[in-house]
């Protein structure tokens, strides 16, 4: 009996109750764990491939967002003594900068030139959705893209009336100030995390993963029997 579960950023693949596999192997039933191990690890790789591909078709991720989806990695491989493989999202957070935006690159805080900035930025998370304007509300400014010293490009808002101690950019330029002469604090605009995206698409992928695991188990049994027959 196979068991494939996904929750809280972890996908676990196990095989329990291997009576059917043992019966199929007959005198070679001692090789059951080895056969199951190979099938489980192959399924983990296939599950990752399917989940990343499905997420790319659903979400309007940009190049950075596509890389972020691939943070789903195999943290644990199955072994003969532990028939379990685990996929895990290493980076949990996401921001709107990983999705389609218009413009697609920062135009604010690039030196002292602000003239290329749009009157309002637009963005979307789902490919099936239209672009939405990022207008400000509740004491927050309109959204805009900014490139951080780490190289990450994020969608942020200014907290109107706040005061930041970061008065210069990484290149030493003076930052924009409000009427009081203060640099306002930046707040990243959130979006579905890679964990949330994979969790959403998992029900669409699960049947294929379950079927693949059964196929791999059968293929490994046949391979073991074929090798034994050649000896």
Name each model-derived stretch.
Residues 1-231:
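Short, Lys/Arg-rich flexible segments
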């Amino acid at each position: 009996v196979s068991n494939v579960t996904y929750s809280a950023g972890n996908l676990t693949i196990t095989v329990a109750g291997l009576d059917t596999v043992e019966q199929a192997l007959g005198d070679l039933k001692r090789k059951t764990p080895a056969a199951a191990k190979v099938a489980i690890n192959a399924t983990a790789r296939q599950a990752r491939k399917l989940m990343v591909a499905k997420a790319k078709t659903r979400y309007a991720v940009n190049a950075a967002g596509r890389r972020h989806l691939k943070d789903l990695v195999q943290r644990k491989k199955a072994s003969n003594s532990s028939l379990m493989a685990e996929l895990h999202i290493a980076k949990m957070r996401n921001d709107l900068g990983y999705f389609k935006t218009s413009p697609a690159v920062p135009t604010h805080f690039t030196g002292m030139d602000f003239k290329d900035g749009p009157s309002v930025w637009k963005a979307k998370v789902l490919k099936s959705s239209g672009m939405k304007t990022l207008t400000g509300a509740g004491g927050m400014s309109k959204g805009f893209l900014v490139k951080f010293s780490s190289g990450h490009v994020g969608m942020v808002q200014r907290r109107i009336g706040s005061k930041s101690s970061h008065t210069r950019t990484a290149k030493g330029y003076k930052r924009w100030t409000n009427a009081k002469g203060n640099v306002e604090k930046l707040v990243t605009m959130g979006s579905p995390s890679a964990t949330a995206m994979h969790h959403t698409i998992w029900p669409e992928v699960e049947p294929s993963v379950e079927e693949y695991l059964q196929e791999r188990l059968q293929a490994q049994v046949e391979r073991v029997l074929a090798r034994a027959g050649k000896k």
